[in-house]
Amino acid sequence: MTYDVDGLRMRMPALKEGAAHFDGPGGTQIPDDVADAIDATLRSAVSNRGRGTAAEWRADDIVTGARQAMADLLGADPRGIVFGRSMTQITMDIARTLAQDWGPGDEIVVSRLDHDADVRPWVIHAERAGATVRWAEFDPATGEMTAHDVLRHVGPKTRLVALTGASNLIGTRPDLAAVAAGVHAHDALFYVDGVHLTAHAPVDVAAIGCDFYACSPYKFLGPHLGVLAASPDLLETLHPDKLLPATNVVPERFELGTLPYELLAGVTAAVDVLADLVPGDGDRRQRIVRSMAALEEYEDGLHTRMREGLESIPGITLYSNAKHRTPTETFTIDGYDSQAISEFLAERGVNAPASNFYALEVSRWLGLGDAGGVRVGLAPYSNADDVERLIAALRELTA
């Protein structure tokens, strides 16, 4: 399996501007294929979904196609694919819906490894319902979070556990399958924030064993919206707030208002790009698994090179040494303001923002407060030249 990063880079129009992008964890650049799919949809006759006019058929086919594409990407059932404005919005809606059945004596488990989108919705609605919130904590010295770190908070009163598939700040990847088994042993639900993970590794929600898996296509070469994968049977048991004339059919009952058809066309195009990162035969799911495995191997090698370069910078602190992680690093440098470092890099054409990136609990637990640090993350189009530019700029800064 040969990963052709140069071939992908040729399809990325934003890269022609010359920047080295380490801002992929906040949102990737998009290929021509995705932009073309969005443009073609907007330039065609548009309508709400139906089976009458050609425009109605087109809208319906776009939605059906996007559900199948996301199901292929995640190893999920297309009948359980829900689209929303963002992962944050979807998670808030699901939390509100589930909390209808929570009350005093119930317990909800969240983690200090998570983006706030997989923390605050659960905390808000647990507190409103009178349920107790329990916090799973990672080791700030290593960035590791073991299954035991989570499951020691799970018991007969637990209703739901929410956990990231990979930290968007430090890359740590918990053992989701082990957590899922422990959660289900207590008949609780398991909600996974897969926003950061989905961009870097093959995902199989059935193998993970989670009840809900949420992600965002704009983190893996697609447009801005959110996606939830769940069992259709589970979704049938949930009754979200919705408009009276809106359908009660699953998964549509969870999708408020008219879907953004042009963005859904872009989602399908993004999944097709991922499926074809490595040439080969097979159906789309098989090609996705093969391509994402090749991408993971490629990024692991490039990450090693980036990590070694970062470790050579005087005064630098890297905030994760977790064994299983994505190619994402957050760092600070003694004597330098993180925002000033980011601006210095930007002046040299290296995009590496500084923030807590909404991973507020992570940042605080690491001792970084609300300011966070400088984050550098690899994306499918990252290459060795990008890494060399980053390290050279940091050496210039600290010389």
PLM feature spans:
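Pyridoxal 5′-phosphate
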Residues: 1-399
